[in-house]
């Protein structure tokens, strides 16, 4: 967590350049490729496992960022043979390096691991450059502790030092491992709140259990497995356990038979239902004598009242504390009806309505030893949710930033307005407030969308602190009323809360507006990451829209380490699919208010594919191929004989508008819904075919490839207007060019797109899906000047217009209507990273095994840079142009190769390019893409840069200079 005194922060730029055994022998399964890669020539035995001893001199590469199932030291994993991953680091001045081999050791304790006694698994030396491998040792059981380390060999066959130890723990793998019961408060029914809001709010229950650790007994380990629905906070001996907030992550927890009767009817027949649980190591918290475990429960999404959702039931808890003593004996403390329950100070909590807290209702010491709970009631058993208990596999929500006020305005009468400088998702925290008992402080989170209320009633006993627990708000400013005395700036901070994802990519350039646009999208995206799903907006709907998610996921992966986040959310989407029909709902986890269309369900194809391209993870494709096929087959049932989709309807009903949206939120008119449906039908079939091909499913590749081609022909036959040479404005031509138009139509379609933008004064006219493709389509078809013009406009409709209006986050509508915290339009920002800066993973060698560096200098830009910590290591690009020439600097991680495109000035040749490090670099060709010639209304004057193209065979920092200066 970081504290920020915010006035104005420049866009984040991640400077990538600017980190005696008893082995258990087993075969290692290697993820994501052949394993040999570019270092195969250095591997003894062609990638077979070989014994190796350190040479006494450390190699040039070293492992770092060790993860288990993409998580850092997870406390509960229920994958029987989890995947272990790392990156390798090397000095950028050391060239041609790679990982030529690896060795993983896994032990049952850190002590054994440090002594080299890998009693669970020792892979031995395995040749290859794979940095993601599956555990291959002794079968793992529930509760097993696994400490692991890795070392790697460099291109010269020299081993690194061992990495620092990392660990994971196995969770409770079987139903029989759970001895605890689901329990709840006796004053609440088992069922959910009614949606009409007639019942009074019920206070959040407190639950506690006292137990003894006999004097003289030494606790070796104590771990608690716990979850509470909708949210819970866990306490032990008077202190909160863990940093997690708003736990657990959101899923489809349970059955809701009423779903079929909602406005957007969906059969309650999902592929899978799950309830995430968490595990915490509490060994150091136990004491001799009395101990107390406690929990506070919130409604969360499990018992929510509101138009966007349908509740499951009243709050409930399951907890199992397992204690192991030094004599080998064990003891369990489990949730059951012997636990005590009382009402707590949180008098009302609802995701949408807000939270009210009355400090007069606090019971000091309620979760600590020595408390008298004789007046408390016994807990009551609760029905177990239909969902399977499963270890939480996504990042938890946490307080990630603390912002200080930048302005405090006194309004009079105990009222203040406080500005924190930018829009965040989270809550404010009151510090050291003094006032009389019963004083009610109301906190109004100022927002353009419904945001919920928040109130704190004081107990009047000295300085008091408070922050919300069971919901979040979206705000830049708050208005306080009922404040006692003067408000001092130190008495109020804003806590930004979101899923714990790390920013690992950064962009910057010479145009401050582009930097600002990228920055406000970054903030918007974080504001919308809660419960390891991404919402459309974090206040009004808070829904995990699959359409918004699929369109922006590539941008997210370019800016964040989002592997664990998307592993979880893509799993939710697959789990929400109807296994009988293949239908994928418009949101996952499903909330009945989510409208959408074909493009929304397309997330089941698009998101796993983008994940594969970015992280190189074939397992993601393997898990989702059947789901992809199921969705494409479902769409096929709604297509006409040619392959065009008009509208879908629930089973046995008329078509529903909110199931048939095409594009969404343009500044003016929408393109044809049918055109958008058919485009995404093609895209899903195409991805299914590509996925099948990657996985060696030749029959699937042929079947879905043929279907994609049939739909493509149908699209071109149905939507092209030969009179105008266009597929229509509002994104029609953009979709067609992305798909690929017939060569004879190409000049006219490009001309139509250019003319349409010019008629709009250089502005866009696209919705969320058309905008996603617009800039890269323009760039790739000789119109990057138009893309740059669109992105640097400051008048409506444009991103710059939002900035001129003072936006610190992206808006839902171009005209400022509705939500002011919607990340969906940020999908187009891949243009900044992949085109303007010019760094992209080669789709034929995904996961940054091969990187394409191809900058597109445009407009008045004089420099740009982009950096990313990829799944293989640190990569970055930086370019500058002056009157004297052009400089391109590329950093290639160990084990990766690259193709580098160096812009050339007029009349320049290969001889005009200078290299800082020629070794390992080979010239390929001069690429001079032909001008798009005028004709039949075509365009002229748009010419790609001429490039000298080079292949780079290994890691290092490479600098290329040419004379393609600023005047070119």
Each language-model region and where it sits:
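Bacterial N-terminal signal peptides
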Residues: 11-21, 25
